[in-house]
Swiss-Prot record:
Name of protein: Putative major teichoic acid biosynthesis protein C
Keyword terms: Cell wall biogenesis/degradation, Teichoic acid biosynthesis
Record Pfam families: Phage_RBD_prop (PF21311)
Organism in which the protein naturally occurs: Bacillus subtilis (strain 168)
Annotated InterPro entries: P68_RBP_TagC-like_b_propeller
Domain of life: Bacteria
Stated role: Unknown. Might be involved in poly(glycerol phosphate) teichoic acid biosynthesis.
Record-level GO BP terms: cell wall organization; teichoic acid biosynthetic process
């Protein structure tokens, strides 16, 4: 098999790609992209099923902005540890495992068409099973659709020895139920705490680590087809600026390579779940290629250097980038919102988390991410607002713990007014423009 160019993510600073509005309240297990239709598919353990809870999972279909479109339920289908997405003549097929009845240490490889609102179980006729694939242990799949290859991870649950291996097949052979393995990658014992894996251009991306990296560090390890480790990096994304986790919980969940269907540019995506039980927050962070970074995050090309007098060590480097969005007023609902016609879908809608009016009568805009340093900020009202002599201003946060909360006050003439004052016309808009900076990881 011809090797393609390795995507080296180790010197790239990750950026938030999206926050996922998934169907269930449990921890994210995995995610995958339908690149042709610009959609994301996620898996979670299904809640509310009583004793079946730990053996069923839910698939959610979302937009690239992380907005939930629909979902389906797989009863007795395991945890949804990892899935593959196949676009077959316009129909999306899910590759997954299904537990074998009465054999808790074994599972079968299956694929089935995604159907919004459906519930499947082990007896559903929609499940295509692959009986000629000789899997004696539990299996987990991943797909490389560019090269039409299937990766099957197996692990030995009988002997408690943490043995895991991944076998690569031609996808069309697998669909035809033919057992023609191409090669196998043996996973070192110390990398057994799996949180996701993905196959791309002959390289296996292996994602490991436990909650808060307590016993096992959060690592991405990349293997080539010769069973050699070619890249490895510890992943620290998901901490806030004080190096804490939201509600002191952080768990790596899912990994996927996104390839722009038009340009071929790549982004390595990793999932992180944080927050308290019953209200988990699931986010995807991106290690973008330069081409994809330019498409998703408006940036300034020249990094900033932090220097303090004479330094014997290289100065810290900071990357300035732009955060900008438009807000529109709905007079009927008395709410400000990001207008659907006024944003870049891959960027702005992921920037704003929520918009409220706080106890001080100011508009409070909560962003998804904090920043290290605020370099510039301006708020500009449109003609409707200026015609009525309504102006806006904010309380600056130079950066840090509260930098994701933007508080905007309103004035009419010399009098302070509320953001939902009757003087504000329907469809009035304002533009918020900020230049901020984050530290460049090394």
């Amino acid at each position: 098999m011809r090797k393609k160019e390795l995507f080296d993510f180790t010197n790239i600073t990750p950026k938030l790609f999206t926050e996922l509005r998934v169907a269930d309240k449990t921890v994210l297990q995995s995610f995958n992209f339908d690149e042709k239709n610009h959609q994301i598919y996620t898996t979670q353990v299904a809640s509310g099923l009583g004793k079946d809870n730990t053996q069923s999972y839910r698939i959610t279909r979302l937009s690239l902005e992380g907005l939930q479109l629909d979902s389906m339920l797989l009863k007795h289908g395991g945890h949804g540890t990892n899935i593959g997405i196949e676009n077959r003549n316009g129909t999306i097929y899910i590759w997954s495992l299904y537990d074998k009845p009465n054999e808790t240490d074994k599972s079968e490889l299956v694929c089935f068409p995604y159907k919004a609102g459906a519930t499947l179980d082990e007896n559903s006729k929609e499940l295509q099973r692959f009986s000629n694939m000789p899997f004696d242990h539990r299996v987990t799949p991943a797909l490389d659709m560019k090269n039409r290859q299937l990766a099957i991870r197996q692990y030995d649950t009988k002997n408690n020895n943490n043995k895991q291996w991944v076998t690569i097949f031609n996808l069309d052979d697998a669909i035809a139920n033919k057992n023609n393995p191409l090669y196998t990658i043996n996973i070192p014992d110390e990398l057994h705490y799996l949180q996701g894996f993905f196959l791309d251009d002959g390289y296996l991306y292996w994602y490991t680590g436990d909650t808060n990296s307590k016993s096992y560090p959060n690592l991405i390890t990349v293997f080539d087809s010769d069973n050699k480790i070619v890249l490895q990096k510890e992943i620290t994304v998901g901490k806030d600026l004080s190096t804490r986790y939201e509600n002191n919980f952080r768990e790596p969940e899912g990994i996927c390579m996104y390839t722009n269907p038009e340009t071929g540019a790549k982004s390595l995506m990793v999932g992180i779940t944080s927050g308290k039980e019953g209200n988990r927050i699931s986010r995807i962070y991106a290690y973008h290629s330069y081409e994809n970074f330019m498409n998703h995050v408006p940036m300034l090309r020249s990094p900033l250097l932090k220097t303090v007098g004479h330094q014997d060590t290289p100065p810290e480097r900071f990357q300035p980038f732009i955060q900008t969005f438009i807000l529109e007023y709905n007079a009927q609902n008395k709410k400000w919102m990001v207008p659907t016609s006024g944003y870049l879908p891959s960027y702005t809608s992921n920037l704003v988390r929520n918009i409220t009016i706080n106890a001080d009568g100011n508009l409070q805009v909560t962003l998804n991410e904090r920043y290290i340093s605020l370099l510039h900020q301006s708020i500009e009202g449109d003609f409707r607002l200026k015609q009525k002599d309504i102006r806006m201003g904010s309380w600056y946060f130079a950066g840090g713990e509260k930098s994701n909360v933007l508080e905007i006050g309103f004035m009419k003439g010399s009098t302070k007014i509320r953001p939902d004052d009757a003087a504000i016309s329907n469809a009035s808009r304002m533009s918020i423009f900020m230049i901020v900076a984050d530290k460049i990881e090394v």
